[in-house]
Amino acid sequence: MAADPTTGGGEAESFFRAAPPLRDQDRVAGDLADFVARHSGSGGGGRLAGVVCVTSGGTTVPLEQRCVRYIDNFSSGQRGAASTEYFLKAGYAVIFIYRRGSKQPYCRFLPEDSFLDLFELGEESDIQVPESHAAVVKTAIRNYRKAIDEGLLLKLPFTTIFEYLQLLQMVGTAMNCLGRQGMFYLAAAVSDFYVPWESMAKHKIESASGPLNMQLNQVPKMLFILRKQWAPSAFCVSFKLETDPDILLQKAEAALRKYGMNVVVANELANYKDVVVMVTSNGRTTVRRPSKEDDVEEQLIDLLVEMHSEHIMQLNQDVHKLT
């Protein structure tokens, strides 16, 4: 029987208790605390629009503790990388939780071939960027360095479902102090099933043993816990991807109610780059990519920024009424 997400965090607590410790956990916690402290109180009349946590890429489910084999989720990280760029452009500070090896902000337009194809040797064996790539490389470096140098981008990598959910918990609790200034934009493709760490084989599973039968557990639904416990005042956006268009919007609306999201972005695998549907308690809004040269994320982020601003302003209005 599937667990009811509204019954509390018992399954989540068991998941975290059994999970292998996050690598560099103390360093990550310190970086998070510094980043959030730097940007807390910057909203309202300040320059910063808010702080958003963008999750991107797919999680893996290891089948062995010393992992050789794993189950993967489809996601290139394109949406998360593009959205991060547009959030930065809109004046947000961004915590970017991303799958190692996935698309990165400002690198989406670089060639997908070997990294070495971006460079060539000059006459004196100095390294140069070919003219064909020079403009896009310069733009990528300029924009990326600006975000890093101004302290507006914090990147936190993951590979496994264990790493991802531990990072999400750490970021959620760290951003709680931001109140409504915080936003979560949960574009990562998160595994629905996993092998509990204590149930895994320690070493590589032997193929000589014959067919493999494996029991997978459901991953605890952390969206409800994020919304109700870790960062209850934040503006929360989740995504629903389906291959069957007949059930997509129905499932998106169910997720909106079930997990208390502010927005669920529904997208179909066949055309996810071209069109998405924003599902809210007030109805549906279809967002389309204007042309092949544009990103659907640009229009999507513009709408979400406006909604987040209204979310923040609502608190200010409530406070004003009390005073």
From Swiss-Prot:
InterPro entries from the UniProt entry: CoaB-like_sf, DNA/pantothenate-metab_flavo_C
Instruction: Please give the Gene Ontology molecular function terms for this protein.
Output: phosphopantothenate--cysteine ligase activity
What are the entry keywords? Coenzyme A biosynthesis, Ligase
A Gene Ontology annotation in the biological process aspect, one of them, is: coenzyme A biosynthetic process
Give the pathway listed in the UniProt entry for this protein.
Answer: Cofactor biosynthesis; coenzyme A biosynthesis; CoA from (R)-pantothenate: step 2/5
Entry EC number(s):
6.3.2.5
Tagged with keyword Ligase: yes
UniProt catalytic activity: (R)-4'-phosphopantothenate + L-cysteine + CTP = N-[(R)-4-phosphopantothenoyl]-L-cysteine + CMP + diphosphate + H(+)
Q: Name one Pfam family in it.
A: DFP
Domain of life here?
A: Eukaryota
Q: Does the keyword Ligase apply?
A: yes
Q: What does this protein do?
A: Catalyzes the first step in the biosynthesis of coenzyme A from vitamin B5, where cysteine is conjugated to 4'-phosphopantothenate to form 4-phosphopantothenoylcysteine.
Similarity comment = Belongs to the PPC synthetase family.
Subunit annotation: Homodimer.
Designated name of the protein: Phosphopantothenate--cysteine ligase 2
Traced from the root, the source organism's taxonomic lineage reads:
Eukaryota, Viridiplantae, Streptophyta, Embryophyta, Tracheophyta
